[in-house]
């Protein structure tokens, strides 16, 4: 099984893959939340597509030519080789262009349904078909390599998914080869034109956010993977291949301020389309990429898990929770979009939905919920959730130029029930602090220099700060929180920026990036001892907050 090291990420708005030094170890077809066809990331026997030198001694490195176009380079005493991996725009496919001076071995072992089914293999003159034995779907590999060895000067491998094996590409002959070369070059041009910057960190973060957008609907998933553990060997393994309202709101904001107004608006449109008038405006905290209800959470018993971290889960039971902060995140993102673009038509088209959110929050703000961290224990009056309900009403006041009295009631309740010994606490029945309290000044609930917040900040620094990183909390319903959280650490950096401590903020951002190596892809948690990421990867809302922090550290407002 793989060690905890940075993996290359590529995506194309339909699905995504992770590449480990020439081996595709995670790939789902036909979309992000589909079962894997290459799943070595979660089990050695769950399928992979690997290319590596025949000889044993070589050096390997990975880098991005442009975002979502990954180069893997092998160097040995006998020469060098390069694999360029990308997912062509608009296709459920992957192209691997190989240029080499040395012999390379390649191995392709797809396994359908998370490693459960071995394919039926059909060899044809111009490639191989891999058929799912329990359905009509198949993978087709177009290749002019007749064996499992790639000889100099190299070749181009094209792997494409078909929902029905009757419509595979193996009968298109030479015409497809010309189209394939064109698709490869145009995909590179697409990302080069789409993301223009000399800042590699910024460029990679934008590439991750755009690569994780499901282009048919405009929705944005939280991460490319499922069940990468928060701590190796632990059971905190969740499926993040869904559209969280909270995460998507952050992503919309980050894309907006990075110049991607259309993509930001599409994310907002996707979420607004889910608002209903019958009950809670957003019934679920998360949705499938097409807007349907997320599937039930189940465990996959035949997979050993990442480094034997069981169970492997697909689906996410948090979908059934009540989370009261999400409407606040959405309305805040809508307000920022409106303020940035002056797009009054957008607001007017969604006026009834925005107003309903305000009405519902005004009537239901005293409910308990599972909180931002999706605690699976008893619901509580979480401070952060109450604050985000205040945010919802505050932003609606600004958008609609009205006064909502319940906003003041929420703030009074929070200050009366969620402040203890001069500090904000995690919930009304707790004396502990929580890293999400760092967001209170970020969302203008309280001034960053207010004595109550400064005491809260001091407690977070004393109680949750670990070797330059910030834990979310000390413990939850599953016990102790083992590793710091990348998102919380960036929040702390954003607070320091507001306090004028920019050098300290930059130190924190540099530390968050340190485990990413040269790829600048960031995970969810940081294993401080090994200086490696844990949890699902790459993590979209971390990259979103990083983009906001980088903008703020340069003195630009968000």
Curated annotation (Swiss-Prot):
Optimum pH is 4.0. More than half of the maximal activity is observed over a range between pH 3.3 and 4.0. Coiled coil: none annotated. Changing residue 523 to S: No change of activity. Optimum temperature is 60 degrees Celsius. It catalyses: alpha,alpha-trehalose + H2O = alpha-D-glucose + beta-D-glucose. Gene3D superfamilies: 1.50.10.10. GO terms for molecular function: alpha,alpha-trehalase activity. The keyword RNA-binding does not apply. Catalyzes the hydrolysis of alpha,alpha-trehalose into two molecules of D-glucose. Belongs to the glycosyl hydrolase 15 family. This is Trehalase 1. It comes from Sulfolobus acidocaldarius (strain ATCC 33909 / DSM 639 / JCM 8929 / NBRC 15157 / NCIMB 11770). The gene is treH1.
